[in-house]
Amino acid sequence: PKYTIVDKETCIACGACGAAAPDIYDYDEDGIAYVTLDDNQGIVEVPDILIDDMMDAFEGCPTESIKVADEPFDGDPNKFD
């Protein structure tokens, strides 16, 4: 299983992740990205069909704000740093 979360402290609202994976990432009123699957808690497994899109977003994030892990983040984007 794969989980994802956005570090909203480092996100610069560039829009790259939503373009790469619109079924996973969206933006708040300030343009800051979040994971729509679980309101950016990193606790819902990303469906297999969306893994490639998620990895494209992860690799394309200029600030490394998108985090990906094999275990849930429990709301903490820095849990595995």
From Swiss-Prot:
Q: Where does [4Fe-4S] cluster bind?
A: 11, 14, 17, 61
Q: What is this protein's record name?
A: Ferredoxin
Q: Which organism is it from?
A: Geobacillus stearothermophilus (Bacillus stearothermophilus)
Biological role? Ferredoxins are iron-sulfur proteins that transfer electrons in a wide variety of metabolic reactions.
How is the cofactor bound, as the UniProt entry phrases it?
Binds 1 [4Fe-4S] cluster.
Q: Which InterPro entries match?
A: 3Fe4S_ferredoxin, 4Fe4S_Fe-S-bd, ET_Ferredoxin
The record's GO molecular-function terms, alphabetically, read:
4 iron, 4 sulfur cluster binding; electron transfer activity; iron ion binding
- Keyword annotations from UniProtKB, A to Z: 4Fe-4S, Electron transport, Iron, Iron-sulfur, Metal-binding, Repeat, Transport
Domain 4Fe-4S ferredoxin-type as annotated: residue spans = 2-30
Q: Which Pfam families match?
A: Fer4_13
Cofactors: [4Fe-4S] cluster
GN (gene name): fer
Listed Gene3D superfamilies? 3.30.70.20
Superkingdom per UniProt: Bacteria
Q: Which PANTHER family match?
A: FERREDOXIN
